[in-house]
Amino acid sequence: MALTQERKNEIINQFKIHETDTGSPEVQVAILTEQINNLNDHLRVHRKDHHSRRGLLKMVGRRRNLLTYLRNKDINRYRELINKLGLRR
């Protein structure tokens, strides 16, 4: 299921750095994580949905690249984000 605008705004408000922040790596990773979790739930029910699985893999790769960028840019922000999202890195 697609991410609703209300849920996206909640995520942005939770992870934003400044008042008009919508594109920081933290916000992007948080939104991608929510989408990945929703798609994982979908794929548990619809195991043969290979088109959605490919989209999931693309999202995971994009999130991985953003996390690598953030880790290289500011390790403290990276660690804080990982703890907030509950990612196992």
Curated annotation (Swiss-Prot):
Keyword terms of this UniProt record: Ribonucleoprotein, Ribosomal protein, RNA-binding, rRNA-binding
GO BP terms, alphabetized: translation
Pfam family, one: Ribosomal_S15
InterPro entries per UniProt: Ribosomal_uS15 (IPR000589), Ribosomal_uS15_bac-type (IPR005290), uS15_NS1_RNA-bd_sf (IPR009068)
Superkingdom of source: Bacteria
Record SUPFAM superfamilies: S15/NS1 RNA-binding domain (SSF47060)
GO molecular function: rRNA binding; structural constituent of ribosome
Keyword Cell inner membrane: no
One GO cellular component, as annotated: cytosolic small ribosomal subunit
Record carries keyword Ribosomal protein: yes
Entries under CDD domains matching the protein: Ribosomal_S15p_S13e (cd00353)
Functional summary from the UniProt entry: One of the primary rRNA binding proteins, it binds directly to 16S rRNA where it helps nucleate assembly of the platform of the 30S subunit by binding and bridging several RNA helices of the 16S rRNA.
Entry-linked PANTHER family: RIBOSOMAL PROTEIN S15, BACTERIAL AND ORGANELLAR, SMALL RIBOSOMAL SUBUNIT PROTEIN US15M
Self-association state and partner proteins as the record states: Part of the 30S ribosomal subunit. Forms a bridge to the 50S subunit in the 70S ribosome, contacting the 23S rRNA.
Family: Belongs to the universal ribosomal protein uS15 family.
Protein's name in the database: Small ribosomal subunit protein uS15
Organism field: Anoxybacillus flavithermus (strain DSM 21510 / WK1)
